């Protein structure tokens, strides 16, 4: 279906709503991923952690975000090239590894952005360019969808239109995630939160990065510091009470202390936060007014840092996510 979506390019954004509406009538809700997921970012680069081929990623992960697509000279357009340092003999070898992971029930998405890259979607032309190029890459490599990790500002109106067009091209099997920073999700008026709400009908999960962050307000109006169970639970509560479904909210954390500048928590603290939100147990000082048994799960930066530490993070958090209600 992705290939057909590229043919819509000239009228991608304009056609998105109409096509998407037809899709939703014919197809059930997305079932491309389990009810609770462990998500990890995979490095298409060597940063001194561990170089991994995709096939070497721990089987605990349900969603793997390939990091990263890059911008081109055309505003909004994205591209992807394998880093030679990974040692792939061919692009086909990488495509075969994606297919093998998918055969195991794992979704592989292409992440757009990161701290180093600037992808700008702020008008109809750039929204069209984003959607057309994203659909092309999904078709070329066999990705299940797109992860939005834009860290230099977004325009919710046009990014929403771009993702609606991607959804129209792929259909309801699209896996669509995002990883905003904490400041991006403090309230529903922020552009990132608006993007999530605008596209909630086909949004798989928001994995806010609860690290590399200063202190932030929780949903109770109190100030919480990063690196604590309360930071995870009280901030996730903002999204849970702000219009997203529990199945669309996940906790993003570093896999090891080296994986982030600040905000690392022990994997058992991640499990406690999941329990607090899903079951009302193992909370810190913040206790949510209700439980959210449908909570999506957890995300980590990154599968490579996790592997560098013997997969201790995924071996601890993965089974716990699987055991959520």
Predicted features and spans:
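Active-site-adjacent alpha-helix of alpha/beta-hydrolase-fold enzymes
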Residues: 271-279
């Amino acid at each position: 279906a992705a290939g057909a979506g590229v043919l819509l390019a000239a009228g991608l954004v304009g056609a998105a709503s109409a096509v998407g509406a037809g899709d939703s009538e014919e197809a059930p809700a997305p079932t491309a991923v389990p009810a609770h997921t462990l998500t990890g970012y995979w490095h298409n680069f060597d940063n001194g952690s561990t170089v991994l081929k995709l096939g070497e990623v721990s089987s605990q992960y349900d969603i793997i975000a390939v990091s990263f697509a890059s911008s081109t000279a055309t505003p909004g357009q994205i591209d992807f090239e394998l880093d030679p340092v990974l040692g792939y003999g061919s692009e086909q070898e990488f495509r075969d590894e994606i297919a093998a992971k998918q055969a195991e029930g794992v979704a592989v998405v292409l992440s757009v952005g990161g701290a180093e890259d600037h992808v700008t979607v702020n008008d109809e032309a750039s929204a069209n360019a984003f959607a057309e190029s994203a659909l092309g890459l999904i078709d070329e490599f066999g990705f299940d969808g797109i992860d939005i990790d834009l860290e230099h500002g977004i325009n919710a109106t046009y990014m929403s239109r771009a993702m609606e067009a991607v959804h129209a091209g792929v259909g309801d099997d699209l896996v669509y995630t995002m990883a905003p920073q904490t400041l991006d999700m403090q309230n529903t008026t922020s552009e990132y939160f608006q993007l999530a709400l605008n596209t909630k009908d086909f949004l798989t999960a928001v994995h806010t990065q609860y690290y590399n962050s200063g202190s932030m307000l929780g949903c109770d109006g109190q100030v919480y510091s990063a690196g604590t169970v309360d930071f995870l639970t009280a901030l996730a509560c903002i999204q849970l009470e702000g219009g997203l479904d529990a199945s669309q909210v996940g906790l993003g954390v570093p896999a090891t202390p080296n994986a982030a500048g600040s905000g690392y928590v022990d994997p058992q603290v991640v499990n406690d936060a999941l329990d607090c939100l899903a079951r009302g147990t193992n909370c810190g000082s913040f206790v949510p007014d209700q439980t959210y048994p449908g909570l999506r799960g957890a995300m980590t930066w990154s599968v490579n840092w996790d592997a560098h530490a013997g997969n201790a993070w995924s071996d601890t958090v993965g089974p716990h996510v699987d055991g959520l209600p």
